């Protein structure tokens, strides 16, 4: 995925998920995506290079970092629980969708049971 499409694609995929809120609590240079008031994705740039921060299971995080050169420990985040995704040939829309969905689900899993039922009906 190239530099221009990383943010656009990630934003579109995140906003397809139920009950997602887009806000800018850290200023206009950080798109912040929340579910139930908790952050699951941040989108910004570092020295002109776009990146996406996503919550990640620690084991999956390490595996993805070994497989995909464009996935690094989370920039300015807890490196055990967050990853940063940078532009790269190996970053496909399908991979990005899986990473975003995993992040959303990890955050929802941490919500109160009543909130989980509200955002994950059925």
Swiss-Prot record:
The organism's place on the tree of life at top rank: Bacteria
Protein name per the record: Uncharacterized protein YbdF
UniProt cross-references to PANTHER family, sorted A to Z: CYTOPLASMIC PROTEIN, CYTOPLASMIC PROTEIN-RELATED
InterPro entries: YjbR, YjbR-like_sf
SUPFAM superfamilies membership: YjbR-like
